[in-house]
Amino acid sequence: MYIGRFLVFGKTEEGYPFVTYRVSSRSFPNRLAKVMDDDTVSILPKELEEMFKNPYITYNCVKLVGDVAVATNGSHTDIIADKIKLGLPIRDALSYSLLTMDYEKDDYNTPRIAVVITKDEAYMGYVTDSDVRIKKVELEAGKAYYLGVYDACKITEHQVISVTGKTAEDLTKFVMDYEEFEKPVTAATVLVKDGFKLATL
């Protein structure tokens, strides 16, 4: 099944919250996730001149703000993080940012998807050309929701998978290797365990 770029978030079998963002692509297999600093993971083209060809190629997919982790499929990562930094509640920061940025104005009207987690709370949201939704969800150890841009842009108990892995590296590899979702390119994970742990693949 091809669901494009997607987020997987839940709890490890040990009960630690995490979120993984994976780029999947039929057309652009030359992307990489790179840890830029202690608070940011970016998606970059391997050939840097490509970033000028499309406004949706280069973006921060992960931002850490205090005790909050934001993960998305686009430049709205920064908007959500900035609003949280200014003191907005997570739900309001998600709502404002998704409505303001709207879906991507590309050939596919690609949805914007987002997940925000702390050690105690988890929110997911999306905006499409016909819908917008934000929801706080309860996480269960060993289980994770997934939210994708193609044929999986919905918030439902039917989009839950079992997960294995104890470290951020384990979880990144698990999501990259998850065979049901086709065309893996790169991925990044934030694990909430004694602070934040970042990993990319």
UniProtKB/Swiss-Prot annotation:
<dbReference type="Pfam" id="PF07826">
    <property type="entry name" value="IMP_cyclohyd"/>
</dbReference>
<keyword id="KW-0658">Purine biosynthesis</keyword>
<comment type="function">
    <text>Catalyzes the cyclization of 5-formylamidoimidazole-4-carboxamide ribonucleotide to IMP.</text>
</comment>
<dbReference type="InterPro" id="IPR036795">
    <property type="entry name" value="IMP_cyclohydrolase-like_sf"/>
</dbReference>
<dbReference type="GO" id="GO:0006189">
    <property type="term" value="P:'de novo' IMP biosynthetic process"/>
</dbReference>
<protein>
    <recommendedName>
        <fullName>IMP cyclohydrolase</fullName>
        <ecNumber>3.5.4.10</ecNumber>
    </recommendedName>
</protein>
<keyword id="KW-0378">Hydrolase</keyword>
<comment type="pathway">
    <text>Purine metabolism; IMP biosynthesis via de novo pathway; IMP from 5-formamido-1-(5-phospho-D-ribosyl)imidazole-4-carboxamide: step 1/1.</text>
</comment>
<dbReference type="InterPro" id="IPR010191">
    <property type="entry name" value="IMP_cyclohydrolase"/>
</dbReference>
<comment type="similarity">
    <text>Belongs to the archaeal IMP cyclohydrolase family.</text>
</comment>
<dbReference type="GO" id="GO:0003937">
    <property type="term" value="F:IMP cyclohydrolase activity"/>
</dbReference>
<dbReference type="InterPro" id="IPR020600">
    <property type="entry name" value="IMP_cyclohydrolase-like"/>
</dbReference>
